[in-house]
Structure formats: C-alpha cells, structure tokens
C-alpha cells in the first residue's frame, strides 16, 4: 500500500510542479500586457504669437499605449485659458488630440497627430453674449523624453510640440489672428 500512496504523492507533486511552471510562464507572458498602457496627468506651458509675450499654463490628461513595437498611440485632453491683445481678449481652449509616437529607444519619442480644438474668445467688460466659439481641426508635431521615477510604475514625461491651426477668424475684433502655438508639458506617466 505504501507503494501506491508514494505513486499518488509523486503524481500529485508532478502535477503541482507542472501547474506552477505553467502559472509562472503565464505570469511572465502577462507582465508586458499588464503594463501595456499609461495614464499621464500633466501641466503645460504654452506660447502663442499673439499672447503679448506671456506664457499660459495648461492642464492635461493623456492615455498612451503601444500598438506595435516601437510605436505608441496617445489620446489626450487639455485645458488652457490666456489673455491676448493687451488683455482685450480672453481665449479658452480645450483640445482633444490623437497622436502616434515612434519610440526609437524607450527614453525618446517623436511623432505627431491630429486634434479637435474648441476655442472660445471672450471679450472682458462686455456682456456674456460678446464671445465667439469655434471648432477647428489642427495638426501637431513634436517629441519627448521619458525618465523612470519608479521602474515599471511611474516615469517623468517631458513633451514639446508645435500645434498648427492656421488663421483664427472671429466675427468680433480682431477678425483674424494666427492661432498656432508652441506647448511644453511635464507629466507623470503611471503604468497600468
């Protein structure tokens, strides 16, 4: 009888070992998938040609993830408010962007994308009706650097991009002005 129970124990140990090896293999395969995306809250600084030399602060949130090796896709949302033309015009913008970034190394990325830019121009000291809202599609080009803070968990993300929107037209003065701008953002990319 002890030979039969030894065979059962040996078979149970063998099955346990195979199950442990399969679980370990599955865990090793799933680790890259589990960290496939990042959520990136950020603060940015924007410089517009008609911003009176001022730098506007913006706030953003992005989701970024790999789509194929060395290529990441990103969806982003941001918000900024600034004064233009000697404080005569208050501009509020909330762009929604989609970007593709080529990552030749894990630390650097370059690329660009498209965005939907909702812009409201308000004229202070006038009725609330004295505002003009427009929606434009624009393109952006840029790049960035990521530096690990806590490997596999969080990294610092520094991004620079040029946004091309062309001429902004308003029914209120100024009738036309250049809407392009440079923006730099610093964020923390949290992996999930």
Region locations from a protein language model:
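Short catalytic helix/loop segments, enriched in acidic residues and glycine
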Residues: 58-60
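Cleavable N-terminal export/targeting peptides
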Residues: 1-38
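Compositionally biased regions
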Residues: 3-6, 17, 156, 186, ...
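Solvent-exposed loop/turn segments connecting transmembrane beta-strands
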Residues: 48-56, 85-89
């Amino acid at each position: 009888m002890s030979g039969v129970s030894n065979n059962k124990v040996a078979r149970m140990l063998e099955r346990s070992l195979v199950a442990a090896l399969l679980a370990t293999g599955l865990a090793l395969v799933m680790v890259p998938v589990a960290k496939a995306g990042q959520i990136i809250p950020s603060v940015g600084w924007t410089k517009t040609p008609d911003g009176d030399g001022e730098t506007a602060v913006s706030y953003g949130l992005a989701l970024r993830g790999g789509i194929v090796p060395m290529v990441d896709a990103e969806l982003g949302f941001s918000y900024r408010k600034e004064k233009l033309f000697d404080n005569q015009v208050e501009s509020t913008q909330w762009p929604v962007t989609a970007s593709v970034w080529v990552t030749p190394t894990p630390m650097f990325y370059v690329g660009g994308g498209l965005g939907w830019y909702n812009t409201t121009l308000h004229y202070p000291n006038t009725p609330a009706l004295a505002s003009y809202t427009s929606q434009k599609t624009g393109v952006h080009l840029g790049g960035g650097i990521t530096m690990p803070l806590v490997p596999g968990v969080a990294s610092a993300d520094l991004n620079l991009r040029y946004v091309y929107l062309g001429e902004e037209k308003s029914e209120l003065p100024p009738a036309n002005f250049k809407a392009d701008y440079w923006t730099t953002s610093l964020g923390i990319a949290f992996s999930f």
